[in-house]
Amino acid sequence: MKTPTEVGQIAEDLITTYCTSAGVETPDDVRKACELLISKAARAIEKYNGHPKSVEVLSRTMSYVATNPMPAGGVQ
């Protein structure tokens, strides 16, 4: 697998393409589209790693987002 930095950039590019392809126009559209993407990703993790691991990943992600808000300008 590529480095975390490389994979992070690939994810950013894919999310941009996904949102554009989905016809996202508003911040609420971004939320809805990304929520569906998060759900699909969690199910993919569950399919190959099991339900407990999927829940663990979602919990870890929730904790990280809750304690590390984006800086002004939205660049992480």
Please describe what each predicted stretch is.
Residues 1-76:
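Solvent-exposed interaction surfaces and binding hotspots enriched for charged
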